[in-house]
């Protein structure tokens, strides 16, 4: 008998919301979704600079809403200005990460090979791509 699949509803906030707006939006979502049906996961993916405030108490920390990142770099550390490692995301903590987004491919010319490296790094680090 096939296993029941979990449905994922993810909100990609893209490059929107300052710190206060991100916290307010997280609080509004938590208030609107005190319970999530079985077989469904809800995830929010704010900009990297907002991950910590959204993850805290008063954000999604004590709610059924999961936290995701919008991007990751596959190297563990190094001179990669502006990039975020898997370990950095785990410390927030992040459970999901968007990869292979059409905007990353179009604007930053990311390739299948790049996305494969990201996926492998995320899986090795315990984050769902």
Where are these regions (language model features)?
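Active-site loop-to-helix "anion-binding N-cap" substructures in soluble metabolic enzymes
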Residues: 1-129
């Amino acid at each position: 008998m096939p296993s029941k699949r979990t449905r994922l509803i993810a909100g990609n906030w893209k490059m929107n919301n300052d710190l206060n707006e991100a916290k307010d939006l997280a609080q509004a979502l938590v208030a609107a979704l005190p319970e999530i049906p079985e077989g469904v996961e809800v995830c929010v993916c704010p900009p990297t600079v907002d991950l910590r405030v959204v993850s805290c108490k008063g954000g999604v920390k004590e709610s059924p809403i999961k936290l995701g990142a919008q991007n990751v770099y596959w190297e563990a550390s190094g001179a990669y200005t502006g990039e975020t490692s898997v370990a950095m995301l785990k410390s927030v903590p992040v459970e999901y990460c968007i990869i292979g987004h059409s905007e990353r491919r179009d604007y930053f010319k990311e390739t299948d090979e790049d996305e494969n490296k990201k996926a492998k790094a995320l899986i090795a680090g315990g984050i769902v791509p």
